[in-house]
């Protein structure tokens, strides 16, 4: 029979949650920056401009 596990402490739970939120915020910031550069036409990523012009 399975034994009950110990409860995760609030501080550990909050640490993990804050790490996840920090990573999510960083990714959101990068995505917004890329979207702005694509919108202004200053993107240095290959194929982005050609893909946008094909769809328009």
From Swiss-Prot:
Biased amino acid composition, Basic residues: 1-20
InterPro entries cross-referenced by the UniProt entry: Ribosomal_bL32, Ribosomal_bL32_plant/cyanobact, Ribosomal_zn-bd
Keywords: Chloroplast, Plastid, Ribonucleoprotein, Ribosomal protein
One Gene Ontology term, aspect cellular component: chloroplast
GO biological process: translation
Region of interest called Disordered, as start-end residue ranges on this chain: 1-28
GO function terms (MF aspect): structural constituent of ribosome
PANTHER family, alphabetized: 50S RIBOSOMAL PROTEIN L32, CHLOROPLASTIC, LARGE RIBOSOMAL SUBUNIT PROTEIN BL32C
Family: Belongs to the bacterial ribosomal protein bL32 family.
Name by which UniProt lists this protein: Large ribosomal subunit protein bL32c
